[in-house]
């Protein structure tokens, strides 16, 4: 069994924010595979399906970003899942828009959602970091992450989300490098990298 969580903030006013790219990726995965209708459990929206023949839970915490670990921790404990079977998808200021990095474990780089998960669950899980870029001034970070994706972002965002959904099974198989290569190739094929 696997748990894939996307980070974001609940509510219509946040749905197109850069900070919600994790939710967007989960929605893309949901639409690409046969998953159950969303239900509410563990302070989250959750759906069940199969990816690569493995039972997989998709989860979108409804606790707001800074408390994401509460919902994720509840789900991991309830399903008795090991951190090696947990993937989280979230926004990354320190990557250019449209870039992706995957790593196991590590620090939180100041991301409050990741801080919360680390505190509630531990640190040895797979992280898919999706670049949203960093504004020129530190004072603009809050406004940037809670700002909506722009029209120019729509040149790369749908392609990135589609590539993640199309290739997520590679991560479940343990092929981190191939996952990264396939996403990079998909973006290059659309002249986006």
Curated annotation (Swiss-Prot):
SUPFAM superfamilies: Peptidyl-tRNA hydrolase-like. InterPro entries: Pept_tRNA_hydro, Pept_tRNA_hydro_CS, Pept_tRNA_hydro_sf. GO terms for molecular function: peptidyl-tRNA hydrolase activity; tRNA binding. Keywords: Cytoplasm, Hydrolase, RNA-binding, tRNA-binding. It is found in: Cytoplasm. TRNA binds at residues 14, 64, 66, 112. This is Peptidyl-tRNA hydrolase. The record marks 91 as: Stabilizes the basic form of H active site to accept a proton. Its main location: cytoplasm. Its EC number is 3.1.1.29. Gene3D superfamilies: Peptidyl-tRNA hydrolase. The active site is at residue 19. PROSITE patterns: PEPT_TRNA_HYDROL_1 (PS01195), PEPT_TRNA_HYDROL_2 (PS01196). The gene is pth. GO terms for cellular component: cytoplasm. Monomer.
